[in-house]
């Protein structure tokens, strides 16, 4: 299959993400499930796919930690005159999980990145899909969050779902990050920027 792509594939210019000075291809994330991505045994990932993330993540639910964060991000909005323009917005809240993605799926879940029936995610549009999960106030809210994640319906009152080309994320304490499933260090301030069509990859023609 790989040989066929090399011989007859087409070039696709894909976005990549900058995380300060580091580069990531499909996801930068923090919070409750991020340790799962680099802490789950590879054998379990291979055998169970996205269920491995759920099974491993459940272990962390008894010790949910939230992070007070300020997220400043650039987005595109309609200016009311039939035109779009870039503007800057700020979100401040307590978050238990967040991910900045340029991917059609994460851990086997297609809608977690905003990809509803493959319509909402474009891999070379210069925009990240951003999901920020708020700290639940009680077990009922926690259950609602888990149901939303399991059913891949993430645009709820317990989450912020947005698109952005550039973000500045600040916190009072160090937060551990994962970049493409690998440990990305602890940070109190990170800048993420989408580099549009930064790399060329070969993809099948069909």
Task: Briefly describe each language-model feature range.
Residues 19-21, 28-30, 101-103, 135, ...:
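Fold-independent oxyanion-binding glycine-rich loops
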Residues 29, 33, 99-115, 183:
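Glycine-rich phosphate/pyrophosphate-binding beta-alpha loops
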């Amino acid at each position: 299959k790989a040989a066929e792509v090399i011989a007859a594939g087409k070039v696709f210019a894909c976005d990549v993400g900058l995380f300060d000075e580091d580069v990531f291809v499909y996801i930068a994330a923090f919070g409750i499930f991020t340790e799962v991505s680099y802490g789950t045994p590879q054998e379990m990932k291979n055998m169970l796919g996205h269920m491995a993330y759920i099974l491993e993540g459940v272990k962390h639910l008894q010790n949910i930690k939230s992070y007070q964060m300020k997220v400043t991000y650039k987005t595109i909005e309609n200016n009311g005159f039939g035109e779009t323009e870039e503007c800057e917005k700020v979100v401040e809240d307590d978050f238990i999980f967040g991910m900045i993605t340029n991917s059609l799926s994460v851990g086997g879940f297609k809608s977690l990145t905003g990809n509803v029936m493959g319509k909402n995610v474009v891999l070379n549009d210069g925009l990240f899909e951003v999901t920020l999960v708020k700290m639940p106030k009680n077990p009922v809210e926690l259950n609602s969050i888990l149901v939303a994640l399991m059913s891949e319906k993430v645009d709820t009152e317990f989450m912020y779902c947005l698109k952005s080309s550039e973000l500045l994320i600040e916190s009072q304490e160090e937060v551990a990050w994962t970049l493409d499933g690998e440990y990305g260090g602890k940070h109190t301030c990170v800048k993420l920027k989408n580099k549009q069509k930064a790399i060329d990859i070969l993809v099948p023609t069909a």
